[in-house]
Amino acid sequence: MKVLKNYAYNLSYQLLVIVLPIITTPYVTRIFSSKDLGTYGYFNSIVTYFILLATLGVANYGTKEISAHRKDIRKNFWGIYTLQLIATILSLALYTLLCLFFPGMQNMVAYILGLSLISKGMDISWLFQGLEDFRRITARNTTVKVLGVISIFLFVKTPGDLYLYVFLLTFFELLGQLSMWLPARSYIGDPHFDLSYARIHLKPVILISSVVN
């Protein structure tokens, strides 16, 4: 029964992911020119490479470890998340240097998209996936995405709202990640960053990352 419920939650979310762009795309393309959307797409593609560095293979590895060691969730979580946080800080530092020293990156869209890196650094959905709590993940993602779409229709009105549009996309993504930390506290307790335990997880994370990529 639990497997069927998890499948239903995941299926409903995937349907939402398909439907929402169908709703927003005509509206967005009517407001912004192909050049504006191309600018967003270009910088977003660059940020994606830094996100890959920030996340490593943590999502896959973290899910596996949490699922396999449910009696020691707190220790495993903070060891893995410490690794994720270090990778995110490194990635964000490199992205900042790129924006500062490469003229082609000195664009407000590129700056705003830096929030996406921070957002991925806060992502702990792998904890709930390991616990097989797909209901919470689906509810969180659905709520945030719907609010994001509503905000676009409410606030994005003219071609001059491109920066606002990009900000809303990244802001609600970040809000969604932050919203998972409160329910996570019952499993992970207070923050406990553990460099020694993070080193233990480093090699398997890199191995999984190389296989996945």
Feature annotation, model-predicted:
Residues Y49-L53, L97, F102-F128, P204-L207:
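Alpha-helical transmembrane segments of multi-pass membrane proteins
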Residues N6-V17, F43, T48-C99:
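Membrane-water interface segments that mark the loop-to-transmembrane alpha-helix transition
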Residues F32-F43, A68-G79, L90-I118, T158-Y165:
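Membrane-interface helix-capping segments at transmembrane helix termini in multi-pass transporters
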Residues T29-L37, F101-V109, E132-R135, T142, ...:
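Membrane-interface helix-loop junctions in multi-pass transport and translocation proteins
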Residues K2-A59, G148-V149, L169, E173, ...:
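Signature of the first transmembrane helix
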Residues I22, P26, L53-L56, L92-L100, ...:
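Membrane-embedded alpha-helical segments of multi-pass transporters/permeases
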Residues V3, R135-T138, L162-L164, L169, ...:
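Interhelical loop/hinge segments that connect adjacent transmembrane helices in multipass membrane
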Residues E65, R70, L117-N141:
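Membrane-interface junctions at transmembrane-helix termini in multi-pass inner-membrane proteins
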